[in-house]
């Protein structure tokens, strides 16, 4: 009898030790992506206010929330009074008008709890003219014209083009993404 009980317990234990399958996520090509401009999404324009809207997005069938750039915006050469999200001043900080890093982390945690994925728009081609990389890096981090002036894309006077021929720029980008 003891051997039978032991065998049953051993079998149950062995069966209960198998790993549960991870929940299957919908293939990306079938996903509903919602682009969110945090500044304009709610009257408050913050992560905390946007977080309150995540259940509604999940109910609408959204799978992925794509946040427009969330980094501080440069001031030099600024277009308009608010500036362009794509004129990144510092890749390693959160735009304070949206809240804190903790507010962002809470937003992402709530999105994940609701089964939503979050994508953060990464601005890889350029920074603002007054970005920490412009003032704190060698001049060869940026594309230069024949006179040695930083180049800009089209009429985007608030975005200085990065020089990807410099491998340090590649390393800097990889480091900022961590």
Range-by-range predicted roles:
Residues 22-48, 52-63, 69-178:
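Substrate-binding/active-site clefts of carbohydrate-active enzymes
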Residues 6-10:
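Sec-dependent N-terminal signal peptides
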Residues 1-4:
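Positively charged n-region of N-terminal signal peptides that target proteins for export
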Residues 15-16:
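C-terminal motif of bacterial Sec signal peptides marking the signal peptidase cleavage site
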